[in-house]
């Protein structure tokens, strides 16, 4: 299995007709610059950068995004007021990721162009409130006026149609593309995602940064520590540094952090991004036609 980097998955997604995103995460600024430059060479279609705002080098990250003329930025894990106006003044479209109506309204007030409302089912870092996508989307739709993108528990055309019936204007899909040939994830982690069933993930570490993980040995260590009424420092000491890299990119399925969504129970294979996109769109169209033919 050939391992490709983050930019390959983003450019493959854009080339397949959807918006590919480069996840800046805890990436060093100059590494992000390299990914952006190579992504631009790999596709002439739009792509964006996803920027969690909790990292200390956020100023350098944003400067590079502007210097490299990225046109779309998804922000998360921070106050949207901090960067939205500055980015929009540079001609950049800003989308903010939220897990509740409260933060959706704050993002709209901050002037973002669209909102991603992400339900509790989503993999990786999430909100502390256990609000499902099924509940969150219509609640947010009822009170915001800007475009709404659904996320969390979406890996099929059926789920895409369902969220759009609930009021979403589009969808953001993460977990399904982890199990793609272009994904930078380690093959051992990809295989663990394919193997995972419903109930094999759980949201934990809510006192730090809530995260949905596959229940492996590291997850079990966290649960054992919770039985001892740990302090925040106890949890930080157990988590350590680079735990996610160890699990998802180095392939340590025992001690690593394995971030994936509940929808892993519907991920059965590893295939090219273009095939995944085609499957989702084909199923979406088929499901839409079936729904139109229903007799109630």
Where are these regions (language model features)?
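Short, small-residue-biased leader/transition segments that mark boundaries at the very start
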Residues: 2-6
């Amino acid at each position: 299995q050939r391992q490709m980097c983050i930019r390959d998955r983003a450019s493959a997604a854009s080339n397949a007709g959807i918006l590919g995103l480069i996840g800046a995460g805890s990436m060093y600024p100059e590494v992000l610059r390299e990914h952006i430059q190579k992504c631009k060479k790999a596709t002439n279609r739009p792509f964006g950068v996803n920027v969690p705002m909790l990292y200390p080098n956020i100023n350098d990250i944003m400067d590079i995004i502007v210097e490299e003329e990225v046109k779309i930025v998804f922000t998360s894990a921070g106050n949207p007021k901090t960067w939205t106006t500055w980015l929009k003044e540079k001609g950049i479209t800003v989308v903010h990721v939220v897990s509740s109506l409260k933060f959706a309204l704050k993002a709209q007030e901050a002037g973002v162009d669209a909102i991603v409302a992400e339900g509790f089912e989503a993999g990786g870092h999430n909100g502390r409130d256990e609000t499902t996508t099924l509940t969150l989307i219509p609640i947010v739709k009822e009170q915001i006026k800007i475009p709404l993108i659904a996320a969390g528990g979406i890996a099929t055309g059926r789920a895409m149609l369902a969220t759009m019936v609930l009021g979403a204007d589009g969808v953001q899909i993460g977990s399904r593309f982890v199990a793609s040939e272009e994904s930078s994830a380690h093959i051992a982690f990809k295989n663990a995602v394919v193997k995972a069933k419903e109930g094999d993930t759980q949201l934990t570490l809510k006192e730090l940064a809530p995260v949905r993980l596959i229940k492996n040995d590291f997850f079990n260590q966290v649960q054992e520590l919770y039985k001892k009424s740990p302090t925040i420092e106890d949890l930080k000491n157990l988590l350590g540094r680079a735990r996610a890299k160890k699990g998802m990119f180095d392939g340590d399925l025992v001690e690593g952090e394995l971030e994936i969504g509940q929808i892993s129970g519907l991920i059965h294979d590893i295939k090219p991004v273009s095939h995944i996109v085609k499957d989702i769109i084909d199923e979406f169209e088929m499901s839409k036609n079936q729904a139109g033919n229903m007799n109630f």
